[in-house]
Amino acid sequence: MNFLEDCISSIISNTKTNYEIIVVDNNSPDKSGDFFSKKYPHIKFVLNKKNVGVPAGLNIGIQHSLGKFVVLLNNDLIVMPNWLDNFLDAYKKFGDALYMPKSLKFNNPEILDGTGGMINIFGFGFARNKGIRDVGKYDEIEEVSYAAGTCMFVPKKIFDKIGLFDAKFFAYHEELDLGWRARLYGFKSYYIPKSLIHHYGSAHWQWSSQVFYFLERNRWLVLLKNYSLITIFKLFPSLILIELSMLVFFASKKILFKKIKSYFSIIRLLGHIKQQRKIIQQQRKISDNEIIQSFCGTIKIPLEANDSIINDKFEKFLSSLCKLSKYDKIVREA
């Protein structure tokens, strides 16, 4: 509960612009929603009877909001002075887009927690520059692949145009999917370094077989929904190699059943994928050629996972496979 209280206190202390706070409690086991709804009667608390998943919870918060803009926040962070004003200044300059702040480690603010979400051409997402020292090198506004869900500023009318988060994701990659989909509709994502947050970063999850199940399943949801069939066809040989390597990797960690489970889940979701593909591909304004320009030909594995779950060899393998898949050619011809 301390995370949520610190987060709320930082918003109240460091926000000058008119705002409302909406807290969505996904049936948390500590009943923090009940506690804080009594302590902060001026804050709107939505108490779900069950855990509906991260994206559905976010959607509920968005639907309860009354303003022109929404900021989606994890509860395990604090915002710094003028954080919201800096978002609004960026909006005045760049217009309708998705925005994210510079994120620093809560317990060591000299270390970056992320300077933008990056997407690998095979659908892997990661936080750029996570774990490196902040030496003033990343203090310029930049376009990124997607705005991380830790803290995301969005003009509400974007949701009216592209739809809300895909609730089928349940956990992980939902913001990657939103950022990709937004870009297809013509809305970019920006990293705004003057807007600062300090993120604890491990309050919600640990690396586990269940995490990898959702990451792998949702990676395929993203690919099948958002790429054109032509691009999927071009990437298909490399995607097969990725799958074979992932099967070997999961087997080596004795969690192969989770990878197999992800395939069955995708099969069950084919109707949903088909429905979403039809909407996205009919309404998209940006070609794969253009959107891939903001992707990267490599992947960086989070430091938290390097020692026990994924090693440098797999990271290098993915980068090599990007070259073998003729990434530059796909960019030119997609």
Regions found by a protein language model. Give the residues of each.
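Short, acidic, metal-binding catalytic loop of nucleotide-sugar glycosyltransferases
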Residues: 9-18
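A conserved acidic beta->alpha catalytic loop
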Residues: 10, 25-34, 50
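Glycine-rich, basic loop-to-helix element that forms the pyrophosphate-binding segment
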Residues: 48-65, 75, 86
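Short aromatic/hydrophobic "clamp" motif used to bind/position activated sugar donors
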Residues: 70
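Conserved donor NDP-sugar-binding/catalytic core segment of glycosyltransferases
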Residues: 77-120, 124
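A recurrent flexible, glycine/aromatic-enriched loop bordering the glycosyltransferase active site
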Residues: 111-112, 121-126, 132-154, 176-178, ...
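A short, conserved alpha-helix in the catalytic core of glycosyltransferases
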Residues: 145-196
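Active-site-adjacent helix/loop segment of glycosyltransferases
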Residues: 185-304, 311-315
